[in-house]
Curated annotation (Swiss-Prot):
Molecular function GO terms recorded: transaldolase activity
Name of the protein: Transaldolase
Organism for this UniProt entry: Escherichia coli O104:H4 (strain 2009EL-2071)
One Pfam match: TAL_FSA
InterPro entries xref list: Aldolase_TIM, TAL/FSA, Transaldolase_1, Transaldolase_AS
Top-level taxon of the source organism: Bacteria
HAMAP family: Transaldolase_1
Gene name for this UniProt entry: talB
Enzyme class: transferase
Source lineage: Bacteria, Pseudomonadati, Pseudomonadota, Gammaproteobacteria, Enterobacterales
EC number: 2.2.1.2
Cellular compartments annotated: Cytoplasm
Family membership noted in the UniProt record: Belongs to the transaldolase family. Type 1 subfamily.
């Protein structure tokens, strides 16, 4: 009897949404994704202490300025954790640009290149790295430029169709539409508190994006993220990739039974619309109160965890 995780792998590339190396060894995902919150959590794991110490020692060699040392050590720690994960996954690691740069295209590009250089200096080629950027207009423009320079990007905190469309038109490598956080918003802001997986608003959003991309021939990878239960995951079987937290990977691995493919596209490829303009993007995104709330909240939360990480690093300098 097969388990649901093995069955899911027939249709979808499974990615681990964690910085926990023990979980990588256990579930053997193709790729892994990290973010400031996951890096902060990983930094509390005793086995990672040597990675922190290395980042701090390295930063001290780069500059005598304490503020710069904190920035350097934080970047180096994210890359050090990524390097450990890359020993265990055959595919790619996603490493996130500082969320406080989400509205600054040039600063985002500079930070992305900095992270890439740290990986390259450690012997990792660009084809094993994805740079994560928030799906703001500025983040999408940064990704468009980085893609032209051979740096593949993962556009995260994606909640609206306008964001998804702009990402595809920018030619970004991959998007991470957030399923569970969409569900959270609808539960908190509407009278409906329970949703069957097929009508879960996060599942519906990702399904619509997947269909739109396939029917217009966009090559941007759709990677569903931020799951609250395995029902959401099973409804998206067939999505290009799904990034899943270890607790849900465990639940899938311990659940018996084959699953059926839910997402696929076999129709003809249609003509693409004209590119969305900045004003159209901002207006359409603004028309979706869930997306407005969740994008802003996500950026704030990642920024808070980035600052906590920097404080932890600062205390060690």
């Amino acid at each position: 009897m097969t388990d649901k995780l093995t069955s899911l792998r027939q249709y979808t590339t499974v990615v681990a949404d964690t910085g926990d190396i023990a979980a990588m060894k256990l579930y053997q995902p193709q790729d892994a994704t990290t973010n400031p919150s996951l890096i902060l959590n990983a930094a509390q794991i005793p086995e990672y202490r040597k990675l922190i110490d290395d980042a701090v020692a390295w930063a001290k060699q780069q500059s005598n300025d304490r503020a710069q040392q904190i920035v350097d050590a934080t970047d180096k720690l994210a890359v050090n954790i990524g390097l450990e994960i890359l020993k265990l996954v055959p595919g790619r690691i996603s490493t996130e640009v500082d969320a406080r740069l989400s509205y600054d295209t040039e600063a985002s590009i500079a930070k992305a290149k900095r992270l890439i250089k740290l990986y390259n200096d450690a012997g990792i080629s660009n084809d094993r790295i994805l740079i994560k950027l928030a799906s703001t207009w500025q983040g999408i423009r940064a990704a468009e430029q980085l893609e032209k320079e051979g740096i593949n990007c993962n556009l995260t905190l994606l909640f609206s169709f306008a964001q998804a469309r702009a990402c595809a038109e920018a030619g970004v490598f991959l998007i991470s539409p957030f399923v569970g956080r969409i569900l959270d918003w609808y539960k908190a802001n509407t009278d409906k508190k329970e949703y069957a997986p097929a009508e879960d608003p996060g599942v519906v959003s990702v399904s619509e994006i997947y269909q739109y991309y396939k029917e217009h021939g966009y090559e941007t990878v759709v990677m569903g993220a931020s799951f609250r239960n395995i029902g959401e995951i099973l409804e998206l079987a067939g999505c290009d990739r799904l990034t899943i937290a270890p607790t849900l990977l465990k639940e899938l691995a311990e659940s018996e039974g084959a699953i059926e493919r839910k997402l696929s596209y076999t129709g003809e490829v249609k003509a693409r619309p004209a590119r969305i303009t900045e004003s159209e993007f901002l207006w359409q995104h603004n028309q979706d109160p869930m997306a407005v709330d969740k994008l802003a909240e996500g950026i704030r939360k990642f920024a808070i965890d980035q600052e906590k990480l920097e404080k932890m690093i600062g205390d060690l300098l």
